[in-house]
Each structure stands twice: as structure tokens, then as C-alpha cells.
């Protein structure tokens, strides 16, 4: 049994937007409580992945147990559960909030409240968490704590009279934060005597011990010798070890209600111990699992192909290894006439897709071609069936389908009101439907739109940042499917369909997108010795075309004057050769062409 009674345990997390200083504040808390010695300290201590440190974002959750001597002379155990701040990982955030009783709301004193922070704060309020506002970066010259306090009160309705000003960089205000966690965050409920239930809020794959599961004991207790049952996956395991994160793993014999720890039980893959699952004892199982469990559903799909065909087995192995530690990643083999063998992969969102791609290239030294991201469409066929399509190239022909439904999201954009026009223009270009506009303060506004997800996953985020000089932030969630006039746009290169360039677009946009595609390809595909026609088509109808002219060899150079029939004979021979070359010739599309098409702005 660990040494802390339930009334002296505090479980809390930090809610903050990207770049508002969450990981730095976590570092200071670890340092101030003596959990990490100063000499071992490195920046962003809880962000273990190299990629996390580099991008300055938290991808996987971490947890740390700190001991703190409070003003009343008692020693308290503070469990800090770190959360990712990005919209792609909102399910992970909701699970880690369920494991806490309180939250520090960290807001940059020079920037104010951002969209993703708000989404997480509302989630925290739904879970009845005690929220402590913290104004970070008050040492910056542009800091305006009073304005930010007003903003938090206006937007969230939180009383900010006792908000804590701090600077995570210099350590100012950190002792006050620790004391207020003890004073204001309620202790966990004393449910040691009830049947054992523990919530999995994170897990990672260790090549030697299998999956390490991070959990919070909600009721009862878990000890090292127990046999446990995971209620959602219905799998049973014998525990090898149980322990706490301080922040390095440290074995203990038992953890009771209210405590946060880890367990190892030779679990093969992260998919067997999913985030949100309930752990209970095999011989005395709980009646019902903890509420809120949901399977991770991929929202964005794309094809991943190795640039060299012989790297295919390496890519397969790398994806299998990544899947051991990332249960949200889905993939299946796919072949394409233009690209050879590869995989169709599903991701939570664009950031998740970029991270997986970057990890494959960085950790496994693979060179990849990525096709344009697409979403899942519901296709109603003429025979009454309904199928799901995640690859535009597999969409049935127009004669076979009745209608196509695409996923829609409700989006809230927070921005200074100078950029209203630019943002409304962007949303309209992306087929957005205006719902509402609210002024939060005199300077800031919230725009609420409903948009097709397909319009968001291309480059909406980049465009939003560009048009608002980086000031806007957004948050969105899926609201269901709607029927739309959608068509499959194919690209034909030398009369052959190039599958990876196939997209599904709205009929009204098809011409502009098709024209943009063929023009872009004309710039990027190198000239051959024969003419290459480039066409964009909907079904059998060509809607845009251009061609790359041939490189000509001057066959008349050696004729100097002479008989005209001799020249004609040579030109005829050349034309015949070109005709044969055109029939036999294969056009190699360079990788830049695929990449440029991804970047092609889809706005008309």
C-alpha cells in the first residue's frame, strides 16, 4: 500500500492551448516539489518523444506523482496528469479529465483564451472539475493580465478574482499554484471498500514488457498479484508489476482508490488495453464498466506508398510497430497502377496524419509518397445498399449510385474582429453554412459555421492562419452526414487514369479544381519525346484538358537543301516512331507532382 490516505491525494491536470506554456509549467512543478533533481531536469520533461519536443506539442499523455508539504504541515500526494491540447486528440483529453478532480487552466497573459482551450474547459466542467485559472507569461512585455481575466470571466464564466499570475519560465507564482491545488482541488471519493474499478487514461508500448497501462483507481484497490479483466476488450491478464510514476516508474505492492499508477501484464498491443477501458478484478468483477468509453474512429484517410518498391515490407513492419503504440492508427494494403504497392491509412485528423508520416520517415528511415487526404463518404447505391468509401478511386460509377453523403462538422473560430470578413470569406469558399456570430469582448469574436469535413482536412487550418496573421484558432466536432452533389474527379495522364490524383469534389467546384490540377501537372511533369495529353474527367466527360508538347529532334539537320521528297520521307519516319513511342511510352509522374496537388488550394 502506498503511504497516502485518500484525503491527502489531489489529482489534477493542466488545460492549455499549444504554446501557452503547459509543459514548462509542468517542469516547474516537478522541480519545485523536488520530484526531479535540478541536475536531471531537461525542458519539457514529460514530453518523451523527440517529435513532441521539436514541435512543442504534447501527443501522448504522461503522468507524474509529486509529494508536497503544504502550509498546514501535512504531506500531500499530487498526481499531475498531462493532456494533449490539440483537437485531434480530444478523446484522450476527455479520458484524462475523467481521472482528475481539478484542473489548472493556463492562459497566456499576452494572448488570451484560444478555441481548443475552451473545448477542453467545457469538457472539464461537464466532468465537474474544480478549475483554477493561471495567467502564465506575465513577465512578457505584452502581458495584460486584467484584460485576460475579463476575457476568461466573459467567455467561460469563471470567477478570476483569485487567478494566479505566474511565469513558468522564471518560476514566479509556482509555490502559490501548488498550495492552491491542495486548498481548492477536492480529494478523491473514499471508495476503497467498493468493487475495484480503474480507468485506463493512457498506455504505451515497451518492447520488453509489452504494453504499459496508465490508470486511475476509481474504487477498490489493485495489487501486484491480482488477475484483472479489461471490461471493453473482455481480456484477462495476470499482473507482472504495479507502480507509480515519480515521474520515472517505481514499483509498489498496491494502489487504492484515488491513486494514479501504471501496470504491466505482458499485454501484446495497445489495442488490447484501450484508453477509456475499465480494469476490474477477475475473481470479484464490478457490475458495470465506467461510463464514456468509445472506440477511436479514424476521420481522415490517405494512401502511403514507398518511393522505392523494395521498401514495401519495411513500411508494413513500421506501421505494425507504430500501431502497437497508437491504437487510433488503422491501415490496410492497397495497390495503385501509378504507385505500386502501399497502404490505405486512417487517422484521427490532419495533425495525427502528419505525426505518423513524420515518425515513419524519421524513426524508420522510409521515403514516402502521401496521397491527398480524404474522408469517409456514405454512398447509397441504386440497388438499395449503402457502402462506406474512404478512397476516392473506389467510388462506384454514377450509374450505380443514387446519392453520396459526406460528413459535416460544426466549427467555432475565435479571432480578433478585424478578421471577420476574411474568415467569413474563407468559410463561404469552403461551402460553409453560417450559423452565428458572438462578440466575446469588444475585440474578439466567435464565428460558428457548419462545413463539410472534406473542406477542412485539406488546408483550411493553414489558410485560416494566413488570413488572420496567425491570430485565429478553431475547434470542431462531427455533427453527422448530409447529402450533397458530389462527383469523382479523375485525372488522365496520356489516357491512363492516375488513381492517387483522384478526388471527390462538389459538382460546382469540379471545373476549377480540374483545371487547376491539369495546369499544375503540366508545370511539373517533365517533357517526353511524344506529346502527353493531360485531362480531368467526371465519368466519361472531359471537363478540362491541356497537353505537354513533345521534345523534337531536328531530323532535317543533315539534309541541307536537297530534294523535298527526301525531307518528307524523314519526317514521316519520325512521326511513325513518335506514334509507336506514344502507344508504348509510360509517363513517370515525379513525386513533386503528387505533393503539389496536395497543396493545390481547392478554393475556386
Swiss-Prot record:
Localization per Swiss-Prot or TrEMBL: Cell inner membrane
Domain of life: Bacteria
Gene Ontology MF: a single term: GTP binding
Alphabetical list of PROSITE patterns matching this protein: G_TR_1 (PS00301), G_TR_2 (PS51722)
Binding locations of GTP: 19-24, 136-139
Catalytic activity, as annotated: GTP + H2O = GDP + phosphate + H(+)
EC number: 3.6.5.n1
One annotated Gene Ontology cellular component of this protein: plasma membrane
Keyword Cell inner membrane: yes
Record's bilayer topology term: Peripheral membrane protein
Record flagged with keyword Cell inner membrane: yes
Coiled coil regions in record: none
Single GO BP term: positive regulation of translation
Sequence ranges assigned to domain tr-type G in this UniProt record: 7-189
Annotated keywords: Cell inner membrane, Cell membrane, GTP-binding, Hydrolase, Membrane, Nucleotide-binding, Protein biosynthesis
Family statement drawn from the similarity comment of this UniProt entry: Belongs to the TRAFAC class translation factor GTPase superfamily. Classic translation factor GTPase family. LepA subfamily.
Protein purpose: Required for accurate and efficient protein synthesis under certain stress conditions. May act as a fidelity factor of the translation reaction, by catalyzing a one-codon backward translocation of tRNAs on improperly translocated ribosomes. Back-translocation proceeds from a post-translocation (POST) complex to a pre-translocation (PRE) complex, thus giving elongation factor G a second chance to translocate the tRNAs correctly. Binds to ribosomes in a GTP-dependent manner.
UniProt-recorded name of the protein: Elongation factor 4
Protein species of origin: Synechococcus sp. (strain CC9311)
Chain's gene name: lepA
Amino acid at each position: 500500500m502506498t503511504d497516502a490516505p485518500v484525503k491527502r491525494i489531489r489529482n489534477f491536470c493542466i488545460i492549455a492551448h499549444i504554446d501557452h506554456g503547459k509543459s514548462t509549467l509542468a517542469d516547474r512543478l516537478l522541480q519545485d516539489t523536488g520530484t526531479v533533481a535540478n541536475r536531471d531536469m531537461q525542458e519539457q520533461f514529460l514530453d518523451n518523444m523527440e517529435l513532441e519536443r521539436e514541435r512543442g506539442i504534447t501527443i501522448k499523455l504522461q503522468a507524474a506523482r509529486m509529494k508536497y508539504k503544504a502550509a498546514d504541515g501535512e504531506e500531500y500526494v499530487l498526481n499531475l496528469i498531462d493532456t494533449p491540447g490539440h483537437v485531434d486528440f480530444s478523446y484522450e483529453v476527455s479520458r484524462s479529465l475523467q481521472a482528475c478532480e481539478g484542473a489548472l487552466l493556463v492562459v497566456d497573459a499576452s494572448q488570451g483564451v484560444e478555441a481548443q482551450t475552451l473545448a477542453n474547459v467545457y469538457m472539464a466542467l461537464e466532468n465537474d472539475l474544480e478549475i483554477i485559472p493561471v495567467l502564465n507569461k506575465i513577465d512578457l512585455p505584452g502581458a495584460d493580465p486584467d484584460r485576460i481575466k475579463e476575457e476568461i470571466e466573459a467567455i467561460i464564466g469563471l470567477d478570476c478574482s483569485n487567478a494566479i499570475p505566474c511565469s513558468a519560465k522564471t518560476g514566479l507564482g509556482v509555490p502559490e499554484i501548488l498550495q492552491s491545488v491542495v486548498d481548492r482541488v477536492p480529494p478523491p471519493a473514499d471508495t476503497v471498500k467498493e468493487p475495484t474499478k480503474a480507468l485506463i487514461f493512457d498506455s504505451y508500448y515497451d518492447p520488453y514488457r509489452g504494453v504499459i497501462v496508465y490508470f486511475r483507481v476509481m474504487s477498490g484497490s489493485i495489487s501486484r498479484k491480482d488477475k484483472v479483466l479489461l471490461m471493453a476488450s473482455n481480456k484477462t491478464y495476470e499482473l507482472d508489476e504495479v507502480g507509480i510514476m515519480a515521474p520515472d516508474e517505481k514499483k509498489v505492492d498496491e494502489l487504492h482508490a484515488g491513486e494514479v499508477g501504471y501496470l504491466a501484464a505482458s499485454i501484446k498491443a495497445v489495442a488490447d488495453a484501450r484508453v477509456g477501458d475499465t480494469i476490474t478484478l477477475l475473481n470479484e468483477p464490478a457490475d458495470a464498466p465506467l461510463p464514456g468509453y468509445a472506440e477511436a474512429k479514424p476521420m481522415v484517410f490517405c494512401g502511403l506508398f514507398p518511393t522505392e518498391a523494395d521498401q514495401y515490407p519495411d513500411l508494413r513492419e513500421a506501421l505494425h510497430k507504430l500501431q502497437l503504440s497508437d491504437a487510433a492508427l488503422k491501415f490496410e494494403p492497397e495497390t495503385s497502377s501509378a504507385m505500386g504497392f502501399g497502404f490505405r491509412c486512417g487517422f484521427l485528423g490532419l495533425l495525427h496524419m502528419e505525426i505518423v508520416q513524420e515518425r515513419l520517415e524519421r524513426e524508420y528511415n522510409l521515403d514516402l509518397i502521401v496521397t491527398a487526404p480524404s474522408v469517409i463518404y456514405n454512398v447509397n447505391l441504386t440497388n438499395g445498399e449503402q457502402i462506406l468509401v474512404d478512397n476516392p478511386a473506389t467510388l462506384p460509377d454514377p450509374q450505380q449510385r443514387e446519392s453520396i453523403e459526406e460528413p459535416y462538422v460544426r466549427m467555432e473560430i475565435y479571432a480578433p474582429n478585424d478578421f471577420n470578413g476574411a474568415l467569413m470569406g474563407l468559410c463561404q469558399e469552403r461551402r460553409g453554412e453560417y450559423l452565428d456570430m458572438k462578440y466575446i469582448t469588444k475585440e474578439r469574436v466567435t464565428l460558428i459555421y457548419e462545413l463539410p469535413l472534406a473542406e477542412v482536412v485539406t488546408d483550411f487550418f493553414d489558410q485560416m492562419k494566413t488570413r488572420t496573421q496567425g491570430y485565429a484558432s478553431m475547434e470542431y466536432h462531427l455533427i453527422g452526414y448530409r447529402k450533397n452533389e458530389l462527383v469523382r474527379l479523375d485525372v488522365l495522364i496520356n489516357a491512363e487514369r492516375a488513381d492517387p490524383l483522384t478526388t471527390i469534389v462538389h459538382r460546382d467546384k469540379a471545373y476549377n479544381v480540374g483545371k487547376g490540377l491539369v495546369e499544375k501537372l503540366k508545370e511539373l511533369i517533365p517533357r517526353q519525346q511524344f506529346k502527353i495529353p493531360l485531362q480531368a474527367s467526371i465519368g466519361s466527360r472531359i471537363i478540362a484538358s491541356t497537353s505537354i508538347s513533345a521534345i523534337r529532334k531536328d531530323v532535317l539537320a543533315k539534309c541541307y537543301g536537297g530534294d523535298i521528297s527526301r525531307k518528307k520521307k524523314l519526317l514521316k519516319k519520325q512521326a511513325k516512331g513518335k506514334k509507336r513511342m506514344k502507344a508504348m511510352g509510360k509517363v513517370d509522374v515525379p513525386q513533386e507532382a503528387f505533393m503539389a496537388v496536395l497543396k493545390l488550394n481547392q478554393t475556386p
